[in-house]
């Protein structure tokens, strides 16, 4: 209990995240041995936004995920950033469970595909924190 309280105090300066982001992070942990923060500032597309040409296969995973979320917005009333869904994780297998909610199923598939892609793609440490360089213009 003390550890939980201390961790909550340390998190006081962290802005709240959409619930879907937590689901994506958990999927990444399910499919992968690398932790999700490794992907927050990777390449030109991993993290918030993106521009330029993806620098490698892992960055292409993020580029594809961004476009998948854009496609989800074409489903009536679907906001992929806030949409939550049901899935199961039996490491490293992820199964999306929402069969009737088209938006939830689509967003879950976007996140599932990204998590699997991250697990398969090589991680090149020289592509971390490169957005401020000319590589992403």
UniProtKB/Swiss-Prot annotation:
Pfam family, one: Phospholip_A2_1
Binding site for Ca(2+): 45, 47, 49, 66
Reported cofactor(s): Ca(2+)
Positions annotated as active site in the UniProt record: 65, 111
Propiece residue ranges: 12-19
Any one GO molecular function term: phospholipid binding
E.C. number(s) listed in UniProt: 3.1.1.4
SS bonds (residue pairs): 30-89, 44-136, 46-62, 61-117, 68-110, 78-103, 96-108
Domain of life: Eukaryota
Residues binding tridecanoate, per UniProt: 49, 65
Keyword Calcium: yes
Locations listed in the record: Secreted
Reactions catalysed according to its record: a 1,2-diacyl-sn-glycero-3-phosphocholine + H2O = a 1-acyl-sn-glycero-3-phosphocholine + a fatty acid + H(+)
Keywords of the record: Blood coagulation cascade inhibiting toxin, Calcium, Disulfide bond, Hemostasis impairing toxin, Hydrolase, Lipid degradation, Lipid metabolism, Metal-binding, Neurotoxin, Presynaptic neurotoxin, Secreted, Signal, Toxin
Protein family (similarity comment): Belongs to the phospholipase A2 family. Group I subfamily. D49 sub-subfamily.
Assembly behavior: Monomer.
Protein name: Acidic phospholipase A2 1
Organism: Bungarus caeruleus
